[in-house]
Amino acid sequence: MNTGIIDLFDNHVDSIPTILPHQLATLDYLVRTIIDENRSVLLFHIMGSGKTIIALLFALIASRFKKVHILVPNINILKIFNYNMGVAMNLFNDEFIAENIFIHSTTSFYSLNYNDNVINYNGLSRYNNSIFIVDKAHNIFGNNTGELMTVIKNKNKIPFLLLSGSPITNTPNTLGHIIDLMSEETIDFGEIISRGKKVIQTLLNERGVNVLKDLLKGRISYYEMPDKDLPTIRYHGRKFLDTRVVYCHMSKLQERDYMITRRQLCYHEMFDKNMYNVSMAVLGQLNLMNNLDTLFQEQDKELYPNLKINNGVLYGEELVTLNISSKFKYFINRIQTLNGKHFIYFSNSTYGGLVIKYIMLSNGYSEYNGSQGTNPHMINGKPKTFAIVTSKMKSSLEDLLDVYNSPENDDGSQLMFLFSSNIMSESYTLKEVRHIWFMTIPDTFSQYNQILGRSIRKFSYVDISEPVNVYLLAAVYSDFNDEVTSLNDYTQDELINVLPFDIKKLLYLKFKTKETNRIYSILQEMSETYSLPPHPSIVKVLLGELVRQFFYNNSRIKYNDAKLLKMVTSVIKNKEDARNYIDDIVNGHFFVSNKVFDKSLLYKYENDIITVPFRLSYEPFVWGVNFRKEYNVVSSP
């Protein structure tokens, strides 16, 4: 990134609509590398650093020169990108060609380029003279999307902007694919990756490190947001290596069925969804069912003496005594004395959402826009509510998050408990969450951090003095109380194999984290930095941000104010051109956010420049919608 741009800002105000200094500095680098040099870039910016806005600002600049195709994983993230495109346009302050920008979900992109599962090679000519931006680049390999990207790269010889950060689930393999896509050379994976008998023994070898440094030199942008303006995190439970874990000791009932499932069904325990299920809750014979349709067809079937299922509805005293789930027993007991909103991560597997719904209802918590809980708990005269988000939930997710994140819900009075499967681990932002729970151990510690990052991020909290509580729950045997202080104590398989599933999973993640951190440090070391005057293509965007910052603190100045002129000439060296720019923003009534007047427009009044507050007003039912083509980014769902 161009550190010379960062040096232009002093005490940058982040609380207004803004482009952050590191985003502008990165934008300069992307323009120079991708547009000027026609080289691909890996934008490896850790979660919460604003990768999406950087990518969209770059797309707006690039649209003046080429077609830009943006590829996102699914419909939900496509909606986020379309919304953020509007934000980026409002901050852009320069010309762009909206018709040259196309946003695709992977499914629509597949349909566009495949006929009967075969790539339509003749149609790929549409991507000549294009730039591809790929969001969540670590997720596109090993499937048709990754195959198609490789074909387009080889056939069309175009540059890619790959967006990634955390998590890279299987780091060495994924990184190998990224190198292959970004470079002009074909990669022999056998030469750069060493493999042992286990997944945790997959490593980038020394030749791989050298290949990475040689082929991606000058093509990496690494950034991690400083840990400031965030609440402190309070981890609960006993010390476990460098974190804390809550041991939830299983009842005899849960432990018995847990062991039956482990013996009968689990051949690759680390990746077996049955173990995810029984570590969260056991359901007797239903533990062995992997089909929800079968599950919902059972009528008045007794699972345990105090638990039955009828057409997909669980009922019985066991949902309150909770011998079926040590994790939910801890959770239900703990939340009774806690204030604020909760975010609870779980793996849906087969029956996770089903168990959660009926445990919550049976213990007095009501379903948001659904069934009321038994003897409902109340807040401000209204029932305490929960919602469950899974991959099947699409159309109503944005509306649900609007309610959850609204200022009126800061105390959880509208929606207190948000349960989510992995669909929420990336891209979404949650606000004012005071309690984060892990009912399932995530697949990687990067994913663990990503889930935390949905909530614990800049601008998500009004009061950062109050801590955020994190509970990582592990189902353990009734007599298990091991202190886990060093990975070196668990290097032998026979010692690991006897451990509870959740503890094994945590150790597995920690072993993987070593390799992940090693690769991250290499990427950080390779990140390109320089100090140059801003690229001509971003000058107006940069000046717009400098003007916004200046008029946040200045409500009224003389037209020939020396400080304003000095700021503009730090970018536009010619004083006459700088004065012309000031004339343009004043006569064009540039939009700013002022600390006194809030949303304002610049005006000339006598010999002064003043900030004039404004408010949009309208008569009921007289909204006008502008359908002019140039204002609409072309996208495919």
UniProtKB/Swiss-Prot annotation:
Keyword field: Activator, ATP-binding, DNA-binding, Helicase, Hydrolase, Nucleotide-binding, Transcription, Transcription regulation, Virion
InterPro entries xrefs: Helicase/UvrB_N, Helicase_ATP-bd, Helicase_C-like, P-loop_NTPase
PROSITE patterns in the cross-refs: HELICASE_ATP_BIND_1 (PS51192), HELICASE_CTER (PS51194)
Record's GO cellular component terms: virion component
SMART domains with a match to the protein in the record: DEXDc, HELICc
Record-annotated membrane-spanning stretches: none
Protein's cellular compartments: Virion
Source species, domain of life: Viruses
Protein purpose: Acts with RNA polymerase to initiate transcription from early gene promoters. Is recruited by the RPO-associated protein of 94 kDa RAP94/OPG109 to form the early transcription complex, which also contains the core RNA polymerase. ETF heterodimer binds to early gene promoters.
Name of the protein: Early transcription factor 70 kDa subunit
